[in-house]
Amino acid sequence: MKIAIVGGGPAGLYLGYLLKRDHSGHSVDIFEQNPQGNTWGFGVVFSDRALDFLNLDDPETYQRLIPKMEHWVDLKLDLLGEQIILDGIGFASIGRLQLLEILSERLTSVGVTPEFSTPLKDLSCFHDYDLVVGADGLNSVVRQQPGFHSETRLLSNFFAWYGTKKPFDTLTQSFRKSPWGPFNAHHYRYSKEMSTFIIETNLETWERSGFSKITDQERIKACETIFADVLEGEPLVQNRSTWRQFPVIQCENWFHENMVLIGDALHTAHFSIGSGTRLALEDSLALSKAIRFHGTDLQSALKTFEKERKPVLSKLVDASLQSAKWYENFGEHMNLPPWEFAESYLARAGRIDEERMKTISPKFMAGLLQYRKNISI
C-alpha cells in the first residue's frame, strides 16, 4: 500500500517504523510541518509500567529507550512546603527531542526519511494514497475533514510548560498560594541537567493576576517568585511556553473512508496522569497490528483498530478527565490538612481503592492510618 502519515511526532514516526518493519513493500511517506530537530516542550513522563507493552511487542525499541530515561520510585506532594511521599508510585521520563531522535533512528533503519518543513492546508496532495493517517496533533488538518465528527472543548484552568535546570529527585506536585490565588506545578527531571516544570492555575486566579495582559517575561518572573522555594534560584526556561487551556478532543468516528486518526489528533488525555505519549505510541502499535493482520483489506483493518482500541483508550481518557476535574478545583483541596489532601489526590481519577493502595504504597498508607487514628482520639 501507499501510505501517507501527516505529522512527525512520536505517533507518526513510530507508526511509520512499524508499518515498514512489518511489510517492506509498503510505501510510507511522513510529512512534518516543522523543521527537523525543531520541537516544543521539554520532557515527557510515563508511569513505571507504561512501556511494558513496548517491551512485549517491540523489544528493540524498548531497549533503546530505557537506558536514556530517568527513573524514580516515589511521587512527592508538596502542599505549602509540607511534603508527603507516596512510595511505590514510580515514573520514568525522557526529553521529547531525545525521544523523537530515537524514533527517527528506528525509522531510518527501515529506510524511511520524513519530509520536514512541509505544512499542509488541505489533503488534496494525497489523492493517490491508499491510506492517510492523521498523526498531526491538537490542530490536526486531517481531523478537519468531514466524517470524523470531532468535538473540542476547553477546560477552565490555564497552564504553561516550562523547563528548569534544577534536576528534581522525583516527580513532585507543588501547590502554592499567591497574592491572586492558588498555583500548582508538576515538575520532574528528564535528564541529569533538566526538568519539566508545568505551571497551572484556575480561571479566577488567571483573571485576577492579569497574566493575560503582561509579557512572557513578566509571567516568568511572577512564577519564579511564587515557586521560589521550589526552584531554589534556578530560572524557568521557555520553549513555546504559551499559557492556554487544555483542549479535550473527542471523535465520534476514528476513521473515514481512507483516513484515520491517532494520538492527539484523535484524543487528548490530561497531562496530570502522564499518559499522552504512551497512548500515542499504543495507537501506532494497534493500527500497525490491524493492518498487518488484514493486509490490503483497509476497511477491515480500520474497523478492527477502532473496535479493539476504543474500549482500552476510553478507560484511560475517562480517568484523565476525572483527574482534570480534581485539578479544576485544586485551590479548594489545598484547604485540607496535608494527609487528607494526599488522600484526595490519590482518589482523583477513581482508579485506586484503599486496599490496592495498601499494596502499592504501604508506607504512605501506614502514615495515613496513623493520622486517622490520631485525629479520632
Show which residues each predicted segment covers:
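Extreme N-terminal starter segment of soluble prokaryotic enzymes
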Residues: 1-3
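Glycine-rich FAD pyrophosphate-binding loop
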Residues: 20-41
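Conserved N-terminal helical subregion
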Residues: 47-161, 365-377
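Conserved mid-domain beta->alpha element of the FAD-binding
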Residues: 5-21, 133-134, 242-322, 326
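Conserved FAD-binding catalytic core of PHBH/FMO-like flavoproteins
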Residues: 105, 128-246, 250
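C-terminal helical "tail/cap" subdomain of flavin- and related membrane-associated enzymes
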Residues: 21, 62, 67, 289-377
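Conserved N-terminal glycine-rich FAD pyrophosphate-binding loop of Rossmann-like flavoproteins
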Residues: 35-53
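Conserved Rossmann-like nucleotide-cofactor binding loop
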Residues: 11, 36, 139
